[in-house]
Amino acid sequence: MGSNLPAQPNLRLTIIAADGLYKRDVFRFPDPFAVATVGGEQTHTTSVIKKTLNPYWNEMFDLRVNEDSILAIQIFDQKKFKKKDQGFLGVINVRIGDVIDLQMGGDEMLTRDLKKSNDNLVVHGKLIINLSTNLSTPNTNQANGLHRSHVQSSTSSGLVPQVAPSSSHPAASGAAPVDPSASNPSLNPQRVPSTTRPSSTAAPASAAGAAASNTHGSRTNLSSFEDSQGRLPAGWERREDNLGRTYYVDHNTRTTTWTRPSSNYNEHAQRSQREANMQLERRAHQSRMLPEDRTGANSPNLPESSQQAHTPPAGGSANAVSMMATGATTAGTGELPPGWEQRTTPEGRPYFVDHNTRTTTWVDPRRQQYIRMYGQNANGTNTTIQQQPVSQLGPLPSGWEMRLTNTARVYFVDHNTKTTTWDDPRLPSSLDQGVPQYKRDFRRKLIYFRSQPALRIMSGQCHVKVRRNNIFEDSYAEIMRQSASDLKKRLMIKFDGEDGLDYGGLSREFFFLLSHEMFNPFYCLFEYSAHDNYTLQINPHSGVNPEHLNYFKFIGRVVGLAIFHRRFLDSFFIGAFYKMMLRKKVSLQDMEGVDEDLHRNLTWTLDNDIEGVLELTFSVDDEKFGERRTIDLKPGGRDIPVTNENKAEYVELVTEWKIVKRVEEQFNAFMSGFNELIPADLVNVFDERELELLIGGIADIDVDDWKKHTDYRGYQESDEVIQNFWKVVRSWDAEQKSRLLQFTTGTSRIPVNGFKDLQGSDGPRRFTIEKSGDPAALPKSHTCFNRLDLPPYKSYETLEHKMSIAVEETLGFGQE
């Protein structure tokens, strides 16, 4: 074949890039280079690109070919080139006559899928090359002294390609570096392809952009305002997160979406689609609920904490499980039981001492008093669960006291937390019926937490005025200009251009809107976790904004402010974030929500023999704004190999670096703002799960619980309008129920223990439906008082129609 070849080169090959190569090692990225061969006689080798699945070479080679020549381009991993499989990463074969006419001349850009070798090793990805008969321009490889040519019969005879300048130390990282385009200050990033997964699901790499727009091999990246489907609509930008997932930024509305805007872009249609997508995301978010946490209606109705221990609980218990004390059944006369003594307080109140147990009680042991507990059977009717005399229950726990109301109803005082409750602490079964242990513990922790002096609202008012369409910036200016002590005063929110007094509803709306805005990935402060696309984690590259630490302090203040004023944020974080807030040590299990691939790889490392399999050191690779650097996990870590003996330490250090160290500055700024309102020693009473509930409330809507804890004014529960109302609510999906709740209470969140703990402007306030308004009018809400003014609609269809319009179309919150 060589005799048929021209004497001089007649074709220029430009090996531009590869995209989405297969990652064979658990941790290490390959060091790819390409070898081009024509007929087994002409061989050319590119330079080595270190540690990447998306190498960019853009190197030119002049070839002597004819129409029947076969051009073979193979890709290898330089670190494994001397091993049996030579680190093979894929090959393409091109017959020259099939793609270009040498006589007529031409210029062809090719993107070919990489193929397997005879060894059938798994390969993946694409190779982008350019073939041109125009050799008039200088060969830049030759000009730079990078041209390598070998005349030999095989490509496996010990090629030693030139290595591009880079760190030669092996490093471990189970995740690709974060794409700097996700946080480019110009909001016009040039995409650097990067992925952690064997298969690339992202849009074509920047090299592909070069392939599509340059016929001479000069590097021209695919702009962030276009992708493989063409140019994005005006104001849209394509970005990629640190996990290689492509998302789109709408600068017109400052929102992000996973869905590519259609080519026939319509602002109204896109707005509707964005709203629909937001509700779908909200619906998925609201479905996050612990499987066993569906008995909120059955948990006892403990009163709010009292600042004075002697104040008895007020009001009755309307719970499915309740405790009731009967009056005396026998006369309090005769001799006291053995070991008992009656004494009198200085105020003249009698009490009784049991010398057998060294305890005291207000209850006369001669008056046989029974504690009955009621629960609901499968039919929903009350049945007695337990009945036993008080005298058989034993002593109260340390610091507890039993007292009686004026109506002889027993209540209990916990002097440890200065709180009161109807529940006898000696009767855990009164709480156990269908109520998870963690919920009982959380409720008592919450009572203690809120009773502390540091959590008491100070005298005075804290006024915050914001614009709905500029809530992030306005809130930042308002909250950061005030001292922590001012923020502890009664919060008074004012929306610009809207009339109304804040009795609680406006502040709930404020936190709902602000949480959606400040956690938006558009601002590059937070990003979606690896576990899903709604839980959040700190963006390690938030430093693109020079003021990012001030913003994190602001966000910490907002979270603390919400907890302090008993409001909820409509956001959830990865589990590790809550652990970090509690200063707990993160574990490998926490890695799953941060980087699923790395979690799987680290787990494999712990469970398998890695000697001779993995070439790891106590270091990791990190990329920041295009600069790749090697970070030691311990002093001199890049020179310390990982063995079976020290791999547990390695896994621990990688986990700590990935979750904690990378965002340490941002997190410390967040906590500095948070602790200005919530002392660290107080929040530490909760565990990470409880802290999540404390910040976000529960994320599901139990209609039965809602109905159970609803009051009526002008209506009765049996009225047809009320029956139709609940029928409509049950027929609605989760998103519509959430919007109804937001319409009526100012937030889509409900308290941890269900609707019985719903808060109003003056403390606990049940949801109320009032008969008010003309049947031709829409329902009206009073979010400060959790009240819905519902006109007496004549039919189910009318009620459903009017409710839908009111809930879906209402934006402002006009309060009385």
Curated annotation (Swiss-Prot):
Active site per the UniProt annotation: C784
Stored InterPro entries: C2_dom (IPR000008), C2_domain_sf (IPR035892), E3_ub_ligase_SMURF1 (IPR024928), E3_ubiq-protein_ligase (IPR050409), HECT_dom (IPR000569), Hect_E3_ubiquitin_ligase (IPR035983), WW_dom (IPR001202), WW_dom_sf (IPR036020)
Composition bias, Low complexity: 160-178, 193-213, 325-334
Pathway terms, separated by semicolons: Protein modification; protein ubiquitination
Record keywords: Cytoplasm, Repeat, Transferase, Ubl conjugation pathway
Disordered: annotated span: 134-238, 254-354
Record field: catalytic activity: S-ubiquitinyl-[E2 ubiquitin-conjugating enzyme]-L-cysteine + [acceptor protein]-L-lysine = [E2 ubiquitin-conjugating enzyme]-L-cysteine + N(6)-ubiquitinyl-[acceptor protein]-L-lysine
Positions of the HECT domain: 483-816
Self-association state and partner proteins as the record states: Interacts with creD.
Protein name: Probable E3 ubiquitin-protein ligase hulA
